Amino acid sequence: IMQQIQEETPKTLPNANIQIIGSVSALCQSAARCAQTLGYTPFILSTMLDCEAKEAGRFFGSLAQTWQKGESFFPSKCAVICGGETVVHLTGNGKGGRNQELALAAVPYLDGMSQAVLVAVGSDGTDGPTDAAGAIVDGTTAQRLQDLGIFVDTVLSNNDAYHALQQVDSLVITGPTGTNVNDLYFLLLDADSEKESQKKNA
């Protein structure tokens, strides 16, 4: 060990050309550009999200609720974007991944909100030991789960988000993407969709 420590450190080669061609920051910026082309005002909140997956999901859900009440600075149509990689502390023996768990934890907060959609996906197309990259949930997900007798808190305590989300067709399956620059989370908020929903129900 001492011999290795005392050895000269490698020097930069004069003919070396190092370029970063992909990063989580670039991923978020690309997502922001896509959102903008679809008419959403993008906000990149963080590219280093690294908390407990369930807490991140609840955070996104609370953002949506605050926006719905008109108590946030977000405009009527926006995309709230984050990048990073959350963690899961296992308490059960179910099947799932951090992105699926994040999305499921947001479900109770989004319940009944026709103007909010949350997507959480891995850039490599893999989320935990599953074939899914992540999940997409909205204001109808909670009721659809409840109709099947599936309760979010029970599922989360068993870390079984995969099977619950599979039952309501909320998994995002892309297959391997050939890259890996952490995960992408985006919350789409659109007040106009609420107005359209009210018109249809009138």
Language model features: what each stretch is:
Residues 18-19, 46-54, 79-91, 123-127:
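A short beta-alpha structural unit
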Residues 9, 31-39, 60, 64-71, ...:
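Structural signal for hydrophobic packing residues in well-ordered secondary-structure cores
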Residues 1-63:
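Accessory alpha-helical/coil subdomains and C-terminal extensions
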